Design a protein with these regions (language model features):
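Conserved inter-motif catalytic segment of the P-loop NTP-binding fold
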Residues: 80-138, 142
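Helical mechanochemical/support elements of P-loop NTPase systems and associated helical scaffolds
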Residues: 31, 63, 94, 123, ...
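P-loop NTPase motor core
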Residues: 116-191
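Arginine/glycine-rich "motif VI" loop of SF2 helicases in the C-terminal RecA-like domain
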Residues: 75, 106-107, 160-167, 207
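Residue-level signal for short, function-critical loop segments
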Residues: 55-56, 86-88, 175
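Hydrophobic/basic alpha-helical segments enriched in Actinobacteria
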Residues: 27-28, 41-44, 92, 119, ...
Length: 217
């Protein structure tokens, strides 16, 4: 005779597993419906180096926001903090991370550790050591994509450390064209118009959630 309970349980598992965007695979962080399906690992691979670049200088803020969104996804997958490392340089018009702003974005400032080493090579070193410490859910770093410090060997070290610790590492290279790298994914990000929210009382259109125009290499 057929065990109906076991059959129903099996069907439930199959249905749940077939729902798009339900979750990433065990070795990946879920990024939601659509994006998960476009990635070979069913999400953002944990033990890997990923690169983000702005499509143009005007998209630097949008790319930073996208990086923050990925950090939010990583925080949902782990109770550990996130390291955000940027080589110190004058912020000019791009500014720096702002606590209340990132909190409104969904990134808990209490779980975010900011580091500002003096140069790009120092930033890469801090990122590698942070990965090897196994203390973080996610390691992010901002390095000038034109820097000589961002060599193929440097990306190999980050990739190796990420694999050994199964910790995702995101490298934001600004708006410069990417150099040789072993990054598993390379994201090019541009800002996109948000969907307006209709304000019922006054029938006004309010700014909606952030959106991005993304290409993946």
């Amino acid at each position: 005779p057929v065990d109906k309970r076991a059959l129903i349980a099996d069907l439930k598992e199959r249905i749940a597993g077939g729902e798009p965007g339900n979750a990433g695979l065990p070795g990946a962080i879920s990024l939601g419906t659509g994006i998960n399906e476009a990635l070979p690992d069913g999400g953002l691979r944990k033990g890997a180096l990923h690169e983000i670049a702005a499509s143009a200088y005007r998209d630097m803020g949008a790319a930073t926001g996208f990086l923050a969104a990925l950090a939010v996804c990583a925080m949902k997958d782990s109770s550990r903090p996130v390291l955000w490392c940027e080589a110190w340089r004058p912020p000019f018009d791009m500014g720096r991370l702002h606590g209340p702003g990132i909190a409104a974005f969904g990134l808990d400032p209490a779980r975010l550790l900011l580091a500002a080493p003096p140069g790009d090579s120092d930033c890469l070193w801090v990122m590698e050591e942070a990965l090897r410490s196994r203390a973080f859910a996610f390691v992010a770093g901002e390095v000038d994509g034109r820097s000589s410090a961002l060599s193929l060997a440097a990306t190999r070290r980050l990739q190796r450390a990420a694999e050994e610790t199964q910790t995702p590492v995101l490298l934001f290279t600004g708006h410069a064209k990417g150099s040789a790298s072993v990054a598993v994914t390379r994201w090019h990000v541009a800002g996109a118009e948000s969907r307006n929210i209709l304000y019922a009382d006054e029938m006004e259109r309010l700014p909606g959630c952030p959106r991005w125009d993304i290409s993946l290499a």
